[in-house]
Amino acid sequence: MPILTQRSARVRDARKLTRRQGRAKAGLFLAEGPQAVREALAATARQRPGLVTDLFASPPAATRYADIVDAALAAGVSVHHADEPALAALSETMTPQGLVAVCRLLSVPLDAALDGAPHLVAILAEARDPGNAGTVIRSADAAGADAVVLTRGSVDPHGGKSVRASAGSVFHLPICADADLETTIAAARARGLHVLAADGAGDLDLDEAEATGLLARPTAWLFGNEARGLPSTARELADEVVRVPIYGRAESLNLATAAAVCMYASARVQRRVR
C-alpha cells in the first residue's frame, strides 16, 4: 500500500475538513484517535452504513490498532497509509495518535432529533467553546439523554475539539446543529417536554426543582453561552429558570459542569419514577 504525504490529493482534501466551511461544503468531518474512530465504525456497523468513508493511518498506528483497520476494511471503508507529517496536518492535537477517519456529517433535522417520545434533551443556545460543547454531548450521552440540539450561533459539533471532547459520544445520540432557538423550544414543548433554563439567577434551585417534582417530568434543558449566559429569549420562553445551588465559595460552575449536574439530576429522578 503506498504511503500518502501532505501533498497527496486525498490528504489535501481531508485537510479542508479542519475548517467549518470545508466541512459544510463537503458534508464530511474528521474523527481523530482510536476511541473516536472505533465509535464511528461501531455506528457504521450498527445503524449508519456509509458513515465512515475513509481512514488514514500511519504505518505504526495501523499495526498498533490492527483491529480498527480490520473493522474499517470489513465495513467497506477506504483505508490509506499516510506518513506522520500527513497525519499531523489532519490533527488538531500536539501528539497525533496516527488514526483519522473521514465521516459524513451527523447533524439531523430538528424533527428527527426530537422524534418519538423524548424524556431528556439538552439545548445549547449560542455555546461557543468547542470543548464545552463536546463535553455536554458526552454528559448528555452518559445521562441517557435522547438528543442534543445546538442553536444558531453555537459552535460546530463536528469540529475537532468538540469531537475529541465528546469521547465518541457524538456517534451515540441524535445531534441537531444550527437550529433556530424559538423553533427548537416550540418543538420541544410540542413533544411534551418541560423547558427548563439553567441560569445562576434562576428563581428555583435544583434541589427545590427536585422536591416539587419538576425534574420527574420529560425535560428539555436550556444552557447558554459560556460568558454571557442564556439569551433573553431563552429565559423568557422557558417554563422555569433553575439555578444550580452553590454550597461552597465558588462564584459559579462552568457550562459543561453545570449541564452535567442538571442532566444527571433529571436522569436520576426520571429513572426512579419510570
PLM features: residue spans?
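N-terminal positively charged helical leader segments and presequences
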Residues: 1-92
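Glycine- and other small-residue-rich loops at beta-strand/loop junctions that grip anionic moieties
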Residues: 3, 29, 125-126, 149-152, ...
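Short glycine-rich anion-binding loops that position phosphate/pyrophosphate groups of nucleotides
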Residues: 34, 60-62, 86, 106, ...
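RNA substrate-binding interface of SAM-dependent RNA methyltransferases
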Residues: 74, 85, 103-108, 113-202
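Active-site/ligand-binding-proximal alpha/beta "capping" segment
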Residues: 196-250
